[in-house]
């Protein structure tokens, strides 16, 4: 019961960290591709 009520508290920081990480990785890969070609 407590896990269901605590899910938003776990997901909010997780999403806040995962989305910028994915954005940085995709951006760095895009920059590397542009530098190579």
Curated annotation (Swiss-Prot):
Membrane topology: Single-pass membrane protein
Principal place of residence: plastid
Keyword Plastid: yes
Annotated compartments: Plastid, Chloroplast thylakoid membrane
Stored InterPro entries: PSI_PsaI (IPR001302), PSI_PsaI_sf (IPR036357)
Classification via Pfam families: PSI_8
BP GO annotations: photosynthesis
A GO cellular-component term linked to this record: chloroplast thylakoid membrane
Keywords: Chloroplast, Membrane, Photosynthesis, Photosystem I, Plastid, Thylakoid, Transmembrane, Transmembrane helix
Transmembrane segments: 7-27
Family assignment from sequence similarity: Belongs to the PsaI family.
Purpose of the protein: May help in the organization of the PsaL subunit.
Classification via NCBIfam families: PS_I_psaI
Name of this chain's protein: Photosystem I reaction center subunit VIII
The organism of origin for this protein: Morus indica
């Amino acid at each position: 019961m407590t896990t269901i009520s605590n899910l938003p508290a776990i997901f909010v920081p997780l999403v806040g960290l995962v989305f910028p990480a994915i954005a940085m990785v995709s951006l760095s890969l895009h920059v590397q591709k542009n530098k190579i070609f």
